[in-house]
């Protein structure tokens, strides 16, 4: 059961595993673009810029080492999407996997949705551990036998074989998005899911690929009047009629599909009023929400904008109930962050299993955890230096003033190319997956 | 809906918060001044249309069938089409064939995470 969380109260985070190449020369295809645990936490999926999906499976805890949680090892890997070129629109379609979402498990097989900018695919991952042997007309290697040599008949039987994990695309949901898909979210009814692009949100049935319903459309009649785009969307965890979507202007709209077929009219609008004296050129850019996630309870939702994480109570639209500063020291760097485009980086955020702690990434391969109950926060680093097995991670600190204490790092020394955009928290245990540019780190709490 | 009765300590906290907010606002305004000094032509509506348009048009490349056919004709004299050093240049010889347009081929190599 997840403890009080990462605030440093009683949880100590230890290095567990790191996946990926060590060398500094990162091929673009190896850039990790999404990380997601399945509903039981047994499987961990990653997607990359090369359109590939790698799934890790947690090993069962060994009897010899009851104090250790199982390690995650490769279970399956496949090419989900390929690069395409739309000749009619002169558009290059990247194969980068933007999001992976698991379906709740219903039978022996596992299902996940993976999407690039334009196409969503439903993948089935199944195990095969037996195969039929003893055919009458075929040899074991598949060659056909000469029928004249068959003198007796036998019934083929299933024999055990080495485990084989197969991934096959079961559905392809294509041609429904003019703009770039940023989110997919499976509904709690397990029958439908939504996909959101910059201007529209569509509702799909998992069984039907040739039709989808448009439920949100914010495209203005005159594109010159465009002032905001959709940045993320998610279904409520247990109310199948409710979903939210966030915008580049820092607002979140909650919609109820029972109200009307087209949910352009929101049911609730969550927006924190800004002090007009604080307004600057950067205001809108840094208020753009890069991720929105409901709490497991469904009572709260969390949003991530460039500098902070906000927790909203669904019952209160006027302002967030909690605000956590992720890297406030970047305010004095906004000019250069705009010039090098870092100000447009889209950080994600996640909840722990019991909604007591939230986590998000930052620069210099730092990531932050905020314990809501104990009001504590901690900065940790994902690096090869602190990757000795079971070594406890040391909290990091960025110094903003003149005097730099020992072990602190100054703002000017931060490496803005080392960004942690994607993190995931195991649904029950204190196990986290943190993606640096091309490596996947797995940390666990000290047992 | 929320109650506005603040205790003394809460008032102090609010004051402090306001101070730090002012400080933050000044920091940010300072950055804005720096940016405007570097780029005097920066648009009136920074978060607005231009910017969003750029975002919506990500991935746009221009294919000209005339260029394509011309280059195809030239290709007969060449061994292999040579993609220009600047792959974003879209005129003339720089887009010889559709095969070059998807600049990246799909990864034939297994992900290093699975290695």
UniProtKB/Swiss-Prot annotation, chain B:
Residues 1-10, 104-115 have a biased composition (Polar residues). Coiled coil: none annotated. Its main location: cytoplasm. Protein phosphatase inhibitor that specifically inhibits protein phosphatase 2A (PP2A) during mitosis. It comes from the Eukaryota. The modification Phosphoserine is found at residue 65. Keywords: Cell cycle, Cell division, Cytoplasm, Mitosis, Phosphoprotein, Protein phosphatase inhibitor. The lineage of its organism: Eukaryota, Metazoa, Chordata, Craniata, Vertebrata. The keyword RNA-binding does not apply. This is Alpha-endosulfine. It comes from Salmo salar. The keyword Oxidoreductase does not apply. One of its GO terms (cellular component) is cytoplasm. PANTHER family: ALPHA-ENDOSULFINE (PTHR10358:SF21), ENDOSULFINE (PTHR10358). Phosphorylation at Ser-65 by gwl during mitosis is essential for interaction with ppp2r2d (PR55-delta) and subsequent inactivation of PP2A. Belongs to the endosulfine family. Residues 1-27, 77-115 are annotated as: Disordered.
